[in-house]
């Protein structure tokens, strides 16, 4: 076939794909608008929820510094009749509403924002500053949607408090600090989240999603988010004059050889059916062109689902670094510091299926769609690792037409990211109410 005909064919196929995506996205968006009608209280709440969202968006706070944010939410849920305990795990909140016998169901949101300068141009854009862990003053913005999550969490709390005749058991609301540093969930658990308070039977959380049309729930049973390890490596050499390399042991050359070897760990030592990522994100070494330095520092991130894959990758990194140092006759083996982050998120398959069925019954057959797993991390995993049946779901947050256009859109952690507030917020609240109502049922005798 001539090249021009092939190109025409490709363009035609691409057009069909985009038209199909647009039609599907618009169908999802129409359904998202209709689903909120099944919860009539939402319409009356919308002005207050929008005001809360804009307030939270304009006043972001960094991990473990979310004092204003926590106070705002605690005051609101306390007014709804929840028993509120503040300061759990630092700035975290636990709010309980007991409503007769039944299961304990936890709904978690995140409090913290990111050290990013917002560039959205919104009238309520953040101009906030904060102090990071190194003591540096940095701009702060909600570039990951935690402001949306908190607003939906509160809206859900308000509707559930009004609908006590529709559910039974204990609703446990958790507002967690420091998700962005992967330390908040562990801090709350260490402070007695599941011992000072009731250990839940189920735990739920939702996150905004830039790959789905606004208002559509995304789900994935089984492994959904990857574990995280940060690896800090220092390679030692023997510095000297750049014109006399024979008198030195060059750590830059050792690092270069190690980098190439490390990149084969995933491609040649890991089962292709077991997802894994090794990224070397930073290299620091040397000062000027004619001096060979004494050392080079490298920073890596390692992601995987399976703990056995994780352990093998970390062991392989050490093996390759040690081997390259020995081959170069380095004065000492590299220093390797591994900082474990979040464990992998595992969505309980049976619970996922139950929640998806409830969403499709209550909000329509297209209200929930399956989505791929991700290699990003989330410390929501800590609650599942503590023995609670847990599910993390996503909520589409991008205008369907923009998504179907094929143009590159801002992603999470971008200074340009913000969700399409409606119908995303309405759908977020509706989905959480439907799922909580599904799980909070009276025991049968």
Provide a role label for each language-model segment.
Residues 94, 129-141, 147-148, 160-282, ...:
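Histidine/acidic-residue-rich, glycine-tolerant segments that coordinate divalent metal ions
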Residues 30-32, 253-445:
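Metal-dependent amide/peptide-bond hydrolase catalytic core
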Residues 56, 95, 107, 146, ...:
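Divalent metal-coordination and catalytic microenvironments
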Residues 12-23:
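Bacterial N-terminal signal peptides
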């Amino acid at each position: 076939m001539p090249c021009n005909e092939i190109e025409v064919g490709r363009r035609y196929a691409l057009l069909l794909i985009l038209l199909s995506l647009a039609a599907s996205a618009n169908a999802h968006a129409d359904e998202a608008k209709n689903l909120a009608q099944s919860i009539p209280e939402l319409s009356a709440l919308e002005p207050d929820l929008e005001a809360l969202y804009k307030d939270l968006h304009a006043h972001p706070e960094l991990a473990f510094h979310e004092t204003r944010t926590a106070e705002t939410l605690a005051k609101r849920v306390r007014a709804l009749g929840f028993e509120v305990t503040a300061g759990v795990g630092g700035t975290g909140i636990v709010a309980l509403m007991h409503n007769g016998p039944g299961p304990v169901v936890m709904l978690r949101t995140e409090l913290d924002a990111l050290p990013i300068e917002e560039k959205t141009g919104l009238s309520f854009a953040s101009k906030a500053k904060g102090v990071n862990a190194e003591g540096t003053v940095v701009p702060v913005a909600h570039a990951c949607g935690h402001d949306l999550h908190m607003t939906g969490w509160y809206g859900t709390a308000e509707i559930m408090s009004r609908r006590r005749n529709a559910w039974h058991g204990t609703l446990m609301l958790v507002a967690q600090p420091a998700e962005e540093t992967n330390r908040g969930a562990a801090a709350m658990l260490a402070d007695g989240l599941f011992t000072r308070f009731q250990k839940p039977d189920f735990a739920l959380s939702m996150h905004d999603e830039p790959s789905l049309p606004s208002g559509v729930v995304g789900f994935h049973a089984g492994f959904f988010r990857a574990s995280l390890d940060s690896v800090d490596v220092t390679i030692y050499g023997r510095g000297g004059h750049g014109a006399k390399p024979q008198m030195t042991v060059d750590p830059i050359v050792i690092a270069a050889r190690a980098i190439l070897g490390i990149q084969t760990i995933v491609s040649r030592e890991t089962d292709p059916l077991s997802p894994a990522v090794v990224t070397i994100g930073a290299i620091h070494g040397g000062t000027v062109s004619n001096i060979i330095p004494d050392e080079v520092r490298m920073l890596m991130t390692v992601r995987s689902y399976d703990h056995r894959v994780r352990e093998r990758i970390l062991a392989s990194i050490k093996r390759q670094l040690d081997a390259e140092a020995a081959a170069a006759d380095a004065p000492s083996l590299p220093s390797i510091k591994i900082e474990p982050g979040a464990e992998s998120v595992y969505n309980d398959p049976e619970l996922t299926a139950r929640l998806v069925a409830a969403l499709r019954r209550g909000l329509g057959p297209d209200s929930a769609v399956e989505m791929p797993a991700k290699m990003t991390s989330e410390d929501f995993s800590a609650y599942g690792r503590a023995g609670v049946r847990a599910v993390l779901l996503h909520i589409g947050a991008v205008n369907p037409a923009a998504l179907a256009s094929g143009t590159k859109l801002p992603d999470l952690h971008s200074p340009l990211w913000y969700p399409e507030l409606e119908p995303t917020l309405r759908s977020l609240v509706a989905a959480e109410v439907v799922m909580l109502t599904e799980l909070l049922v009276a025991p049968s005798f």
